Amino acid sequence: MASLPITPESANLSNITGHFQTGQGPCPRLTIYPIVRAGPGYYGDRGDICLSESSTAGAGFLSDVCRDWEAAALPAEDAGIRVVHLRIGVIISRNGGALPQMLTPFKLGVGGRIGSGRQFWSWVTLEDVVGAIHHVIDNETVRGAVNCVAPEPVTNNDFTKTLGAALGRPSVFPMPAFAARLALGQMANDLLLSSTRVFPRRLESSGYDFLQPNLAHALETEINAR
């Protein structure tokens, strides 16, 4: 969800309750567990508040989509099936997601913060997304909401400065909030300008060791990979 545009039309995909209907009673022999992908947008725009899996849902379109998406798995949970709601942050990958879209302006020397730059972005590498999925599948004690984000959320200002440094380019040309809204409408508020300072408490407490916990190293690895 963090790497794809979310629109009111695509939000209808959250109406997937029927796919989780399992009949009456528990299914003790079922060994395939649904992993429901959501995102930190579940928490809404929360400023610099530290957010964990126990934090309440926020308000707004994207928060509503995430909440409805997770609620669609309730029939499976009610049937006794272990369900994991993986709330995946902004994915750092050279092959897709947010990073390739950001590289061009920065390579041209016209990149910079978005809006005030004070909004927190909760990010994660694709390598750790895959690692987290394997971890929650193998660890049967993990269920419910799991924040799949790196343990070091950063402000957009720090993110863009770190990206510029990794490319050896300046990051002094900000995108004003109004320009982001002109380009993306309400999605700018939900995806770029909102602040979600999310921490992966359940992954860490269940023993997952992040492969790329540091943003600078993660960006350098992705940018320099061949």
What are these regions (language model features)?
Residues 38-39, 71-94:
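Conserved beta-loop-beta element that borders a ligand/cofactor-binding pocket
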Residues 129, 133, 148, 159, ...:
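Non-catalytic, hydrophobic alpha-helical segments
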Residues 190-226:
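C-terminal amphipathic/interface module of NAD(P)-dependent oxidoreductases
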Residues 139-186, 220-226:
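Mid/C-terminal beta-alpha module of Rossmann-like enzyme folds, strongest
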Residues 1-60:
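Conserved Rossmann-fold NAD(P)-dependent oxidoreductase catalytic core, especially the SDR/UDP-sugar
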Residues 47, 66-67, 79-81, 92-101, ...:
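Glycine/proline-rich active-site loop of Rossmann-fold NAD(P)-dependent oxidoreductases
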Residues 57-62, 89-96, 116-126, 137:
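Glycine-rich "substrate-gating" loop/helix at the edge of Rossmann-like oxidoreductase active sites
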